[in-house]
Design a protein with these regions (language model features):
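A short, amphipathic alpha-helix embedded in the catalytic core of nucleotide-handling enzymes
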Residues: 3, 139, 168-172, 200-204
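A glycine/serine/threonine-rich, flexible loop-to-helix segment
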Residues: 111, 162-170, 252
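N-terminal Rossmann-like NAD(P)+-binding domain of SDR-like oxidoreductases, especially those catalyzing
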Residues: 1-155
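Hydrophobic alpha-helix immediately C-terminal to the catalytic Tyr-X-X-X-Lys motif of short-chain
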Residues: 131, 135-139, 169, 227, ...
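The catalytic Tyr-centered alpha-helix of NAD(P)H-dependent dehydrogenases
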Residues: 121-128, 152, 158, 162-166, ...
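C-terminal substrate-binding subdomain of Rossmann-fold SDR/epimerase-dehydratase oxidoreductases
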Residues: 173-256
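Generic recognition of short, well-ordered alpha-helical segments
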Residues: 45, 67, 78, 108, ...
Length: 256
């Protein structure tokens, strides 16, 4: 959406398995292909003539990833291979890749982290994201293709899937259903507004050099319990906040 508004010619590849969330006025301005990112031949054909590839295709959602670990990794790894092939055969020398804060794993629970720390991914999603970061580094060394890998921290905003925590809480609060919180609610997240994430992404796309990794976050932690209270207050909801049990690994960390 932001790229179109800047006057760029944009080509979109998506399976639409979760529906079409592109606004109608923007959809009319893009060239759209309903294609799976793992379809190497199609991705290469469609991306011919492009100056840059933004690779943001992935399976998202903690529960979905937990239930489909192999499929999650296959789509991540094969999707990246497809994008790398397209960049190579079409002589596209820049890739912007959506990685995740999840690569830090338990390390992020214990201390502040930066891009240079030795990471400790704990989910199939985060492991695959880290693999792809390493792959991009080798792609630069071997093929000269430059890239930026962006480790997003819990992005939220309009049109987000309601299986994610913020839209789920809003949905529950607006109909006065119980707001369900896993565990104590003391687990923390660094929530990043999608507008800030977009600004950072576009800025980094203009400064792609070598292979670099960046964190995109707001530097302020909030607990899930605080989030539930804020959303309840914002919506003037009569919802009760229900704390429910979940496996420890489920709520200590989440994909970003």
């Amino acid at each position: 959406e932001a790229l179109v508004e800047q006057g760029n010619e944009v080509v979109v590849i998506d399976t639409l398995l979760r529906g079409n969330k592109i606004p109608k006025h923007i959809f009319k301005e893009v060239e759209f292909h309903q294609v799976d990112v793992t379809d190497e031949e199609s991705v290469a054909k469609i991306s011919k003539g492009a100056d840059m590839i933004f690779h943001f295709a992935a399976i998202l959602g903690v529960d979905i990833v937990a239930d489909n670990p192999i499929e999650t990794m296959e789509i991540e790894v094969n999707g990246m291979q497809s994008v790398a092939h397209a960049a190579t055969v079409n002589q596209i020398d820049k890739i912007v890749y959506a990685s995740t804060s999840g690569v830090y794993g338990h390390l992020a629970l214990e201390k502040s982290v930066d891009e240079d720390i030795l990471v400790d991914p704990c989910t199939s999603y985060a492991m695959a994201k880290r693999y792809n970061e390493i792959y991009l580094a080798s792609l630069h060394d071997e093929k000269g293709i430059q890239s930026s890998a962006i480790r997003f921290f819990n992005v939220y905003g309009p049109r987000q899937d309601n299986r994610m925590v913020i839209p789920r809480f809003f949905e529950q609060a607006m109909i006065n259903d119980p707001i369900t919180v896993y565990g104590s609610g003391d687990q923390t997240r660094d929530f990043t507004n999608v507008k800030d994430a977009v600004k950072a992404t576009i800025l980094l796309s203009e400064k792609v050099h070598g292979m670099e990794i960046f964190n995109v976050a707001n530097e302020r932690e909030s607990t899930i319990g605080e989030l539930a209270d804020v959303i309840k207050s914002m919506t003037n909801s009569t919802s009760e906040i229900h704390h429910i049990d979940a496996p420890k690994k489920r709520y200590d960390y989440e994909v970003g």
